[in-house]
């Protein structure tokens, strides 16, 4: 598909996820179902690095809703709740950041997140590096 054509119909939400190769087909099928239920007129484009388990998703909701926060929430839920059922990660290669930090628990256990916080506090005791990008400390 042509990226310019896809991006010409905003809003377009981009996602970067990773999951086991054996789960790819099932995840895409389940995502099509979840996204289709949330946005019957929406369009889903899937690109990626299938050999390493990374997918790039371009979601165009085409929603009649005027509430951009509600549209984004529904799009995020369709991607990440489906991803959780397939034991995927919310970021394949583009990091967590503010957009994904509320979904980090899907990819990492509470123990792993606690360790990440501890490392952050140890390496950045004054919290000046990337404040609030992955989690609040």
Please give the residue ranges for each predicted region.
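Alpha-helix capping/hinge segments and adjacent helical runs
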Residues: 84-96, 125-129
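Activity-critical C-terminal alpha-helical subdomain
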Residues: 101-137
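Short amphipathic alpha-helical interaction segments
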Residues: 67, 71, 75, 96, ...
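A glycine-rich phosphate-binding loop feature that marks nucleotide/adenosyl-phosphate handling sites
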Residues: 47-54, 93-103, 132-137
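Hydrophobic, well-ordered secondary-structure elements that form the walls
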Residues: 57, 79, 94, 124
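Alpha-helix-loop-beta-strand connector modules within alpha/beta enzyme cores
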Residues: 77-79, 118-119
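C-terminal substrate-recognition/cap domain of FAD-linked oxidoreductases
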Residues: 1-75, 82, 86
């Amino acid at each position: 598909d042509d990226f310019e054509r896809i991006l010409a119909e905003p809003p377009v939400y981009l996602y970067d996820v990773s999951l086991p190769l054996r789960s790819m087909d099932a995840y895409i099928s389940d995502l099509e179902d979840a996204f289709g239920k949330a946005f019957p007129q929406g369009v889903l484009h899937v690109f990626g690095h299938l050999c390493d388990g990374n997918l790039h998703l371009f979601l165009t909701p085409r929603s009649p809703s005027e509430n951009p926060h509600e549209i984004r929430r529904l799009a995020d839920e369709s991607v990440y709740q489906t991803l959780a059922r397939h034991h995927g990660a919310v970021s394949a290669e583009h990091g967590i950041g503010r957009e994904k930090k509320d979904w980090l628990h899907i990819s990492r256990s509470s123990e792993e997140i606690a360790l990440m916080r501890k490392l952050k506090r140890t390496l950045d005791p004054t919290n000046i590096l990337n404040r609030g990008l992955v989690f609040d400390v």
